[in-house]
């Protein structure tokens, strides 16, 4: 039997001695060495192999490995031992040859062994990879289409096509079939093509509506557990959800319509949004061109959509790696799921799913990995997103807003000392504008100075001039010990232990009078104006202000819980660079429920006016306090 070295087909001597279950000529089973860098093609391929074995017999042997697998020297040696004796090698490379560090070595050994090789990007034809491939151009194009279109049927026809091309069999082979690249998916209804049809099946008037989008590859591979988890949690919270799969870029050759079309056809109707917020699990930027960073659109579609977009992170760490990591996310996660989406103005949130190896496939030897939901983080992002969404359903008159001055060090002469910003005047301007927009203010102070004087006349973070009794009398509120104890017991056990070790049993001693925690600040109708609580002791603030280890005092936690649960703020504003919230102990990025910024801000929508000339620390605020940055000039 001959083997093609440059085209993928040659003359064969056909024997009638070896036929499959349907009588088709089958000289031998095809051996394919397959490298996948995404894993999304693995599950459809395995299903196709199982069906093919049932229908045709043992006609294909595929050994499949990921780039992570091949980083292990023994795995690499075993794979190449099979590959150099195979009938075809398929290198499916998301991101080009650079994504596979061992590409040159693998390609060289395949050429030396005279093995036909297909190498290509998963989503677009790469001229360099096409020139490196040793199968013919027509064969290369056909394999690319089968792989790019994806799914079980295309995978099965790919195997049959390769049998015909490389072993001279004569199976009936279907042409590559374009899948639905865009559509609505729901675990109770499957695939739904149009928004109107989905609304007839699953929409309740008067509820907040959350959009959710994810890659079509997850839908084709049935890698949907994290999607199902988000859908179920949104609906459990009495909200509508519109879950949409898509191929994010418009590609005429592939037939994909892209993110802008999806927004116009699934998240908008008659030019108006039908969602109140969008959870995005997509990676990279959707509005910037690669490399030159020029905008793809005159008016970005997110601006037309006009709702908050909350970035849900899919980490390529395992959940165990993520939980144990002080950094939180690996550099690839940060680049793809945080830094680039920030160009689109997304609000960075938390990891909702982590990579997990579920089993090793017996047919291909592939380690099967899926994105498994991180249940508590799913609840977190849904709660945060719903709170953003509800702002569209609450009248301005009813909205409750907490405005927080920074106060470092915690003295009265240091209230509102944001860098490059006249904080008192700025808050006065905010109050004036809120009143003009119909927010529920009782009265507008005469000036920023008058505002600060009114705060100083009550209780502040400066404990030098007042006894605990006086502070308690002038406090806007007191948190009883039993109430704080309930809040405290909601924290993870390890966090409770750390806080007790540093600050004593709750409620501690800082800002406490007769067992009650003192809440500084003033109220003005539905507006609360407060001071960010101190990180620690007044006597030594600088030693702990940027401490990576010292847990927050009981008073710090109680203050933010009071804002959320007693004052019942719909949103909070932190005024200017910078406070302590985003510098609290915890992971660098991709926070867990045991990270103190996450504990403090909870699920409150956070708006943060921030000076434009300090993107580094502004980035810290975005990524660790889930805030919407509003830049101001110097």
Features from the language model and the residues they span:
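An N-terminal assembly and electron-transfer interface module characteristic of large anaerobic redox
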Residues: 5, 9-634
